[in-house]
Curated annotation (Swiss-Prot):
The modification Phosphothreonine is found at residue 104. Residues 92-111 are annotated as: Disordered. This is SRA stem-loop-interacting RNA-binding protein, mitochondrial. It is found in: Mitochondrion; Nucleus. RNA-binding protein that acts as a nuclear receptor corepressor. Probably acts by binding the SRA RNA, and repressing the SRA-mediated nuclear receptor coactivation. Binds the STR7 loop of SRA RNA. Also able to repress glucocorticoid (GR), androgen (AR), thyroid (TR) and VDR-mediated transactivation. The modification Phosphoserine is found at residue 105. Residues 19-96 form the RRM domain. The gene is SLIRP. Gene3D superfamilies: 3.30.70.330. It comes from the Eukaryota. Its main location: mitochondrion. Pfam families: RRM_1. One of its GO terms (cellular component) is nucleus.
């Protein structure tokens, strides 16, 4: 538990201003409303996004939970087991997108 808490805390520092959890292993039987309801116990869910596959009509088994604050995200990350429809979800902080092309970062680099 301490290792996962440390990872969560470190990830929170890198995602300041972006209180978003990335959720994997969402069972195909679960609706986005169930996901929203589950994560609402940790704080206000501003947005719940679960992308669908246009060919199959089913969601892709992953999604994003946008919280109102870093504290709410932290509360969700502290929970060891997130279970919906009997399936344990994999929850982690959303990582910043990789920089592409001409994009730059204001993050200091060690060379």
């Amino acid at each position: 538990m301490a290792a996962s808490a440390a990872r969560g805390a470190m990830a929170l520092r890198t995602n300041i201003g972006r209180p978003v959890a990335f959720v994997r292993k969402i069972p195909w039987t679960a609706a986005s409303s169930e996901l929203r309801e589950h994560f609402a116990q940790f704080g206000h869910v501003r947005k719940c996004t679960v992308p669908f596959d246009k060919e199959t009509g089913f969601h892709k088994g992953m999604g994003w939970i946008h919280f109102s604050s870093e504290e709410e995200l932290h509360n969700a990350l502290q929970q060891e087991n997130h279970v919906i429809d009997g399936v344990k979800l994999h929850v982690q902080p959303q990582r910043p997108k990789a920089l592409q092309g001409d994009q730059t970062s204001d993050e200091e680099k060690d060379f």
